[in-house]
């Protein structure tokens, strides 16, 4: 009796652990752990690092334990991702934006480690590369929104990511027909003047100048990016800081891959963000916003990006949160050394449809079949699409697709970045370029990088960000609007410094007035949100302090959730000491309830019912609370649409659903049960069918021709038109002589 009891206790204990250490975050992440370090302490360290003067204070330290090991992060502000002309625009305005929340670092004492991310409201979000693989850290409420959590962030390993078919049907960025249409279109570009053959102008400069140009080219290894985000991307991440952090994370991820690749002698290829355009939710109805429409196909979305002039950039991308057809996560124009347009450094030109377009473009989405993909997936997608821009088609052949090899040793290493179909992401080759890709990319780099690549270097005064060695940064003379800071056109030693007698500059933060003084303690610097109070200046810094949280269990997210520690992360059920549950169809619930918020008593799954049911009428006053469109439903087997119907997620498409409907065993069981219960109806239907067929044969037989000559001819069908024949002239038969006359005459002869 003791042994079964012990086993039951062990199973219960294991099940309790599963809630935190075994449950997936979504269909792409199998395993995670929670992080609960002190966010207030990290926020204070972040503020101190921003104001740091001494070398030691410039570092941000973060220690925590997860996945059976200790992480001792030592990070410093990262300014290498933004060019000297960096701008952030939104709603037709240039913002004085500070990127001091972007950090790069390493694990203290672990050689070869690397970390990159952002610190927003005292929480680190990003990735950490270790000897044992890469870990990813994200806010917990991005995945878990239905209960109180003992942690604020989640951390998971790259091996625990289930990769979707991230490049669409048959594993491609789009199907073959789309690629073929794009290739043919790229051939129709019309070159303009000297731009058509820049190599001729280089050749005419003489051997001495050409040698100098090659020397200069050795350092021109940086591709400058223009990245736009549409209103849906902003809506998902919520703030400009979070959007900038996502862009920084993607650029840093591909920068790491390309910098460590030797493209036939061309090394240290890097990326810098030159300009960012953020379309906020207020731009959704702006007629000048080309991405304002909700239903845009992936090809049209790329075309809208290409219709803008991107001559000032190496590449121009748009990030969105759209669920494109066939699960496509990215699309880009493929570059070529010559013969067709498209790819890096491509200039705007006229094409066969009479439109001017820039084909140095691509698009990325973070949504796939109704779910948001992990950062690792979109990072690889970004690297793959940029690989197309750099001139690499999909890998093919035994040399460059080792994952298809019959040799187990080669197969174990997996396929490369430009492989046409989805990879597991955890193989040795998954984050590398194949020899085929390197050869193709090297040819394009040799031919085109002279046209737009720049020398790499640290960002300088004039980009609107207060960086190391700067007191302020209001931009260049045509951008600087405050009287507190010397603009970037001033002489060295003076530019990006506070003017004499000035306390601060608005470029340092929102708590500095236009009169160059700190705002008083009572002035607001941040609007309140569902779960956080408005930000109030402290009177001694230009930065806006962190907002105080609103009381726990305050309604948020349209009364579907409650606030927990300043985050809209709890279920509305918790407000009434209940637990949220799923109204799944397997529980015999009405299909209409699948998109309702459902609650149950703690530890009593049998009490699970909709908030609009009689069972919970006292708590919710008969009010039915519905899930937000896009929320998972039916035990994560589908998602709610805008009509509050649970749509099952089926990656196989409508044909597979039709096949399941026709060949479902349940269908035939139901038919058999009905026949047994209503045998008399089946008998009547059989007799009626026989009589119908007999009558049909009897009626139609009199009109059917027969080869039997003894049967009467067929009757014409009623309403049949008869063809009239024209009257024929009556011919007289020839006269014949009487037989006697004939014989007599014959006899006379």
Swiss-Prot record:
Catalysed reaction equations from the record: Endopeptidase of broad specificity
Motif range (SH3-binding): 709-716, 723-729
Any one Gene Ontology cellular component term annotated for this protein: Golgi apparatus
Transmembrane segments: 674-694
Family annotation (Pfam families): ADAM10_Cys-rich, Disintegrin, Reprolysin_2
UniProt keyword list: Cell junction, Cell membrane, Cell projection, Cleavage on pair of basic residues, Cytoplasm, Cytoplasmic vesicle, Disulfide bond, Glycoprotein, Golgi apparatus, Hydrolase, Membrane, Metal-binding, Metalloprotease, Notch signaling pathway, Phosphoprotein, Protease, SH3-binding, Signal, Transmembrane, Transmembrane helix, Zinc, Zymogen
Protein known as: Disintegrin and metalloproteinase domain-containing protein 10
Motif Cysteine switch, residue numbers: 171-178
CC cofactor note: Binds 1 zinc ion per subunit.
Cofactor(s) named in the record: Zn(2+)
Regulation: Catalytically inactive when the propeptide is intact and associated with the mature enzyme. The disintegrin and cysteine-rich regions modulate access of substrates to exerts an inhibitory effect on the cleavage of ADAM10 substrates.
